[in-house]
């Protein structure tokens, strides 16, 4: 990259992108930015982008452009993987429905939680099959066990889908949501989050307020119980000092990351 673009121009660009992330220059972060830039240029060339353009070689927001290409690459790969997974998903979903009755629960809550905004939508799955398909497409942790299905069955939390309105049938982010709308987790490809999530956060907050106006007495009761369970679990995680072992957050305290990811419902005014 340095040879192709010129040493001075490349170093200046790396400093600019590092400051964009941290507000100042940081050598450790600069190394990560350099790796992202290298990955981005490799992906851009493979998808046929014009590498002679300044805007391609030196994108204004490197992280955003890098993440966009990662998401597109992942989407193409997962579509191929899913072609051979249909039968196994159906078989597994059938067993999960017998055990946890996801379809029946979601029929009761669909009108409370489904919502269309100007650019994004929240979708309530039909049942376990939809959830498994979403998890296998995005390759995140829901598919690896029954924990989240158990939580749905006792109304501790639900699994919903955050989608782009322009592409409503393609998995984007999976949300773990408490009754009432508090979002515990937001996960996309490889159990991760990307720069594009920031654009959707105002919509999530808008949706949370809409949900508050639709709450039933039973859902309010479930929301209170869920909040108490979450507080207890966070306290236990903090006391035990559980560490994340893999991924971008490896080495960090699990409870800190869960608290950072949490989007609690703001109280309605008036």
Which residue ranges define each predicted feature?
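Glycine-focused motif/segment detector
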Residues: 1-270
């Amino acid at each position: 990259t340095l040879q192709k673009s010129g040493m001075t121009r490349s170093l200046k660009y790396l400093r600019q992108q590092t400051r964009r992330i941290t507000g100042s220059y940081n050598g450790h972060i600069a190394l990560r930015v350099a790796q992202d830039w290298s990955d981005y240029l490799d992906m851009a060339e493979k998808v046929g982008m014009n590498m002679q353009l300044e805007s391609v070689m030196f994108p204004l927001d490197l992280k955003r452009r890098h993440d966009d290409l990662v998401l597109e690459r992942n989407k193409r790969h997962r579509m191929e993987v899913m072609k051979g997974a249909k039968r196994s998903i159906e078989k597994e979903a059938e067993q999960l429905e017998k055990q946890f009755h996801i379809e029946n629960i979601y029929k009761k809550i669909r009108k409370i939680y489904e919502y269309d905004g100007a650019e994004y939508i929240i979708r309530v799955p039909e049942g376990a099959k939809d959830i498994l398909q979403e998890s296998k497409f995005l390759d995140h942790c829901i598919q690896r066990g029954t924990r989240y299905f158990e939580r749905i069955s006792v109304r501790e939390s639900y699994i919903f889908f955050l989608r782009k309105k322009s592409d409503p049938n393609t998995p984007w982010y999976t949300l773990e949501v408490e009754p009432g709308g508090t979002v515990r987790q937001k996960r996309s490809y490889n159990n991760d989050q990307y720069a594009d999530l920031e654009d959707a956060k105002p919509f999530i907050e808008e949706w949370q307020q809409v949900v508050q106006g639709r709450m039933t007495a039973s859902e309010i009761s479930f929301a209170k119980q869920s909040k108490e369970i979450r507080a207890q679990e966070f306290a236990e995680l903090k006391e035990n000092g559980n560490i994340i072992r893999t991924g971008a957050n490896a080495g960090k305290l699990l409870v800190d990351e869960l608290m950072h990811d949490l989007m609690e419902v703001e109280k309605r005014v008036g």
